[in-house]
Amino acid sequence: ALSSAASDVYKRQGLIETLEKGPLAGYPVIGVKATLYYGSYHDVDSNELSFKLAARLAFQNACPKIKPTILEPIYEVKVVVKDEFVGTILGDMNKRRGRVLGMDQREGVQEITAEVPEAEISKYAIDLKAMTQASGRFSRKFLRYEEVPEYLIAKIVEEAKKYNTK
């Protein structure tokens, strides 16, 4: 038989397992505080599985109320290009959901600084080479996480469903 302390461990473990594969596209859930207000233990009917399932069901019932979202990594991107390619790069950054923060002129080249979601720059080296006749270069540095725009969440969830059913 389980002790009351063991049931608390199983409830916690059930919640942790549920949070590791969240409701939106299976990504982990972060920034959640959970408080157990009521739970009972019975020598005959209580077991590990029942407590884990109870924690999972409690979280699933709470999800519509907490309005989960998806976060994405944002990078600071510095692009150095010849003056003739500045317009092309600025337009491209806009297409990639980037926010241009500034530009610095240096001896015939411009350094463009922008914040761009990682998903939009995964193949940027190849694209930059094509846009600048192989003369541009860039660097990137992780900054923070931000919420994915609402219009993209449904697409991400749908793609994850396809991937998870294979």
For each feature predicted by the language model, list its residue ranges:
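Single conserved hydrophobic/aromatic residue that forms the stacking wall/gate
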Residues: 1-6, 10
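Residue-level signature of catalytic and energy-coupling elements of molecular machines
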Residues: 11, 32, 79-82, 93, ...
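Conserved P-loop NTPase/AAA+ ATPase motor core
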Residues: 11-25, 29
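Beta-strand elements of well-folded, non-transmembrane domains
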Residues: 17, 36-40, 83-85, 118-120
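Interdomain boundary/hinge elements
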Residues: 25-33, 63-80, 99-117, 134-152
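Glycine- and Gly-Pro-enriched alpha-helical subdomains that act as flexible
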Residues: 38-74, 78, 83
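Hydrophobic side chains in well-ordered alpha-helices
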Residues: 89, 124-127
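Short, low-order "capping/linker" segments at domain edges
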Residues: 115-123, 148-166
